[in-house]
Amino acid sequence: MGAYFLKKQARSPILEGFGRNIYALLSFSGQQYFIIAVCIYHFLLGNPSNFMNNDPNNHPLPGNFLGTIYKGGIIVPVIQTLLLTVLALSIERYFALRSAFGKGSLAKFVANIKAALAAGDIKKAQEICDKQRGSVANVVTSTLRKYEEMEKNTSLPKEQKLLAIQKELEEATALEMPMMQQNLPIIATITTLGTLMGLLGTVIGMIRSFAALSAGGGADSMALSQGISEALINTAFGILTGALAVISYNYFTNKIDKLTYGLDEVGFSIVQTFAATH
C-alpha cells in the first residue's frame, strides 16, 4: 500500500501533461469567477451600444440578446458565476477523466487483461498496464504486484492470500476515486443553486413590477416592463444553468461508474485466477 501511494505521488496521470495545464488554468476560486461575471455584466452586457439611445436605462435594441440579459438585474452576475463555474469544472473533469481512463479503450484494456490472466501471463498483464496508464492501470498494476507477492509467500494460507489481494485492490481503488470525483459535489450543488438563484431573480422582478403598478395609483409602463423582463430573464438563465449542471454531473458520474465497473471486473478476474491456480 505504501509503495503504491509513493508511486502515485511521483506519477499521477491526472496531473501530467495537458491535463495538468488545464487543471491549473481552470483552478480559479469562486471569488475570481464572480469578478469575471461582474465584468461581463457591466462591460459586455451593459455596453451602451446594446440599448436605445446608447443608454443602459432604456430598452435593449430590438433583437439585442446581450442587452436583454443585462435587464435581468443584479442576480444575473450571480447566475453567471454559477454558469462559469459549471463550464470550467466540466472542462477540467473531462480532461481529468480522460487521463484516468488511460490511452486506449477501457473495454479493450479490460478484455486484454482478462485474456492475459486466463493464459496465466502476469508479466504480459503488467506490460498492458504500462501501455495503458491512467487510474485503472495504476490500480491493476498495484493488484498484480500484490498477486506476485502472494505467489512468493509460503507462510500464509490461500484464504489470507486472496484476502490480501482483494484488500490491495480496494485500497488502490480508494486512493484513485477521490481524484476522479473531485469537483463533482460542486457541480451537483449548482444543479439546485442555479435554479434557486433564477427563482430569486424572478421574485425580485415581480416585486418591482407590482411596485410600479402601485406607484401613484397608476402603472409606469417602463418600470413595469423592466420588472417583468427581469423576472423572466432570471428564470430562463437560472433554469439553463441548473440544466447544464445536471447534464454535466450525470455525464461524469456515468463515466466514473463505467470506470469503477471495469476495475471491479478486472479485480474479480485477478482474484479468481489466483484462486484457480494456487
Segments (PLM) and residue ranges:
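Hydrophobic alpha-helical membrane segments of integral membrane proteins
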Residues: 78, 126-129, 203
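Residue-level signature of catalytic and energy-coupling elements of molecular machines
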Residues: 73, 87, 125, 140, ...
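Cationic, low-complexity basic patches in intrinsically disordered or flexible, solvent-exposed regions
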Residues: 9
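Short, membrane-interfacial amphipathic segments enriched in basic
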Residues: 15, 53-62, 155-166
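Helix-termination/interfacial motifs at the ends of transmembrane alpha-helices
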Residues: 39-62, 68, 177-255
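Hydrophobic membrane-targeting segments
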Residues: 20-108, 252
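Predominantly long cytosolic amphipathic alpha-helical stalk/bundle segments
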Residues: 102-194, 208-211, 247-278
